[in-house]
Amino acid sequence: MNSEKKHKKKSKMERGLTNRHVQVMAIAGTIGTGLFLGAGRSISLTGPSIVLVYMITGGFMYLMMRAIGEMLYQDPEQHTFINFITRYLGKGWGYFSVWSYWLSVVFIGMAEITAIAHYVQFWFPSWPSWLIQVVFLTILGLVNLIAVKIFGEVEFWFAMIKIVAILAMIATGIFMVLTGFETPYGSASLTNISEQFSLFPNGGMNFVMAFQMVFFAYLMIEFIGVTTSETKDPRKVLPKAVKEIPLRIIFFYGGALLAIMSIIPWRELSATDSPFVTVFELVGLKWAAALINFVVLTSAASALNSTLYSTGRHLYQIAHDSPNRFLKSIKADTLSRHNVPQNAIIASAALIGLAAFINVLPGVSDAFALITASSSGVYIAIYILIMVAHLKYRKSKDFMADGYLMPQYRLLNPLTMLFFIFVFGTLFLQESTVMGARGSAIWIVAFGIYSQWKFRK
């Protein structure tokens, strides 16, 4: 018993991630699976101006990362940015945030494992969804349990697949435009974008609705900051990983979307089919659908892998800061001999596995949209709280004047919060997301009040 207590106190999570791991994960971390599958749907909403939606949303996510990065740079020992909410806003908001964030990431994990089963059934339609989910959860769970170095290596190669796929799309677009490649839709040309351009071709409301779709593509971008804490030199790795986010967004999202719309006039794009598949089939790649399915499968597996990493560390933090009988019974506050939060990862994986039951709930026709909306709403509340915590940090004795500072924070911090509130409002505009939005709103109010009451007793 004494040796176990000693182990709890002295053990620290392994700093096994290298700069190579973090930089590639940082690139891939800004690229959501939605780009490969949902680009057609988002383009159909608002045409070429979808690029503007991606740039605006990406810009505000970058500003949030600058706020998180500034605080992590000052205290690189933190393994979760939620600790800054506790430190600067109090235990009540910290309790609300750490549980809400953990649950919202679990919801995202449920969406990811649901998607993985769908992608595998592309090749094996007779395989039951629950079996696919169990197999992937087990494999990726083991990856997270062995050592953080193994997690980093697996994520590195998952990330490379996404990056290569987008580079191939951009290169294909450049080649087809330069050669005037003829397709059934006409010649590949930039005029497919510029001709009869309108900022709101389908009305202002569709432009507004595109923001919540794009926002979900960026969720968990803060994972970039979390991973840097498990590198040997976080103060060197963190600024480089964060400051390159805008260029990555412009190049990968902007480049891919412009390439797609240059090849195929946007009004001809299917809202349901992947434009990546369509483009690669145009250049004669008969197995394009299988190729893109493989890319999105590895992308979803990468996201689930990161989710297990994140939820395990956040539950470990909860077990330390706000222990309860259940967390004590599963020893969620202990590390394995590999210095990873083994029990916390297993508990998180078990909860994510409940996705199979959610998918058959009566009355829920679109489980993925329900989970997406719920997690997005709760996520927005956490993002707003971290921005408030950043304002408090700037006025605290912890402020590091020569640190990695967020630029023009007095203006850009409040603007970022207003943008997040705007995105939350868009969740109520679509039938498939309004149920989840209402649920997240009820959670934010009810659990927020309870959390404040709990620490004022």
State each model region's role.
Residues 117, 130-188, 215-219, 242-247, ...:
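Membrane-interface loop-to-helix entry segments
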Residues 77, 100-114, 218, 222-231, ...:
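Membrane-helix boundary/coupling elements in multi-pass transport proteins
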Residues 83-86, 90, 122, 241-305, ...:
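TM-loop-TM module centered on a large, flexible mid-protein loop between adjacent transmembrane helices
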Residues 8-13, 51, 125-128, 160-293, ...:
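Helix-loop-helix junctions that connect adjacent transmembrane segments
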Residues 1-6, 83-86, 112-133, 165, ...:
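Helix-loop-helix connectors at the membrane interface of multi-pass transporters/channels
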Residues 14, 37-132, 136, 245-250, ...:
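Extracellular loop-to-transmembrane helix junctions
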Residues 158, 330-340, 380-431:
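C-terminal membrane-solvent junction of multi-pass transporters and transport-like membrane proteins
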Residues 1-40, 44-49, 61-66, 77-78, ...:
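Membrane-interface "cap" regions at the ends of multi-pass membrane proteins
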